[in-house]
Amino acid sequence: MQKMRTLGEFIVEKQHDFPHASGELSSLLASIRLAAKIVNREINKAGLADIIGASGNDNIQGEEQQKLDLYANEKFKAALEARDQVCGVASEEEDEAVAFSKELNKNAKYVVLMDPLDGSSNIDVNVSVGTIFSIYRRVSPVGTPPTQEDFLQPGNKQVAAGYVIYGSSTMLVYTTGNGVNGFTYDPSLGTFYLSHENMRIPENGKIYSINEGNYIRFPTGVKKYIKFCQENVPEEGRPYTSRYIGSLVADFHRNLLKGGIYLYPSTQSHPNGKLRLLYECNPMAFLIEQAGGLASDGARRIMDIKPTELHQRVPFFVGSKNMVHKVETFLETYPD
């Protein structure tokens, strides 16, 4: 029987893929692993403790913060600061980027951007939620505090990205630019084991994921694409299946495994879409491209967009390559 590889063993193995690697990125990923275990424990007992529901505060986007959002944010920040490989973090839950003040952190080479608990409003009803993270090499001089420019880098500069999905089982999925690998958590041992090696998304899928309750507000091209998905054309595998959980990590994870497309377009009330370029779209774009798929804002590759602000939003279309190409064609054919 083949020995099961742990996440820690796999990270050390893959360190050899990077010439002159000194282990700093490996240590950084280990800190994310630790924080994920802590957050997973709290999520699993959320219904028994006073940590579900709203905190009474809003984040910078005006969205009501959940208690577990804030808990996850603090745990990930603490884990990242403790390892000394990160000079600062930017979080969906923070108004501004946070610079770590310890001298060792100032000498660190990396910054981390994260959505500490995506889909947290679903916890009350026991729906899967997740953590999304993105890692960049800083551009400011080592030994100085991080600057805004360290965080406002296009997605094509990412050195690693991934997510943790807290569901029927807990998984950590990540890439360092050499494919996508998934690890399933064994709570009895407190260990992540390699369970999904070299994950690939099919070029074609049969699932489309979108909140159709907003249909009336969608651009014409998106409306036409939805009708295309619903047409009865058996020889082309249509109609497709509509599956929408409302938790980006959960919808993305299913489509990555099965093949499909996730759509969050612009609407009349949100002309730039609702998802954040830095905390959600860029890391998912890096993952999907490494798995053989595509991510677009409807006209441009997501990872080529130069950010102008920390909490910038963009329309988001991500998934199987041919499905993303198709929705781009509809948006080009039916401009509003």
From Swiss-Prot:
SUPFAM superfamilies under this entry? Carbohydrate phosphatase
What remark does the entry make about the cofactor?
A: Binds 2 magnesium ions per subunit.
Swiss-Prot/TrEMBL cofactor(s)? Mg(2+)
Asked if Hydrolase is a keyword of the record, the answer is: yes
Binding of Mg(2+) 1, residues: E92, D115, L117
From the UniProt record, list the reaction(s) this protein catalyses: beta-D-fructose 1,6-bisphosphate + H2O = beta-D-fructose 6-phosphate + phosphate
Q: Where in the cell is it found?
A: Cytoplasm
Task: Return the EC number.
Answer: 3.1.3.11
What keywords are assigned to this protein?
Answer: Carbohydrate metabolism, Cytoplasm, Hydrolase, Magnesium, Metal-binding
* Family matches, as PROSITE patterns: FBPASE (PS00124)
GO MF entries: fructose 1,6-bisphosphate 1-phosphatase activity; magnesium ion binding
Chief subcellular location equals: cytoplasm
* Lineage top rank: taxon: Bacteria
Residues given in the record as Mg(2+) 2 binding sites: D115, D118, E280
| Residue ranges of coiled coil | none
**Which pathway does the UniProt entry assign to this protein?**
Carbohydrate biosynthesis; gluconeogenesis
Q: Which family does it belong to?
A: Belongs to the FBPase class 1 family.
Question: Quaternary structure?
Answer: Homotetramer.
Q: Which HAMAP family match?
A: FBPase_class1
Q: Which NCBIfam families match?
A: PRK09293.1-1, PRK09293.1-3
Write the protein's name.
Fructose-1,6-bisphosphatase class 1
Gene that produces this protein: fbp
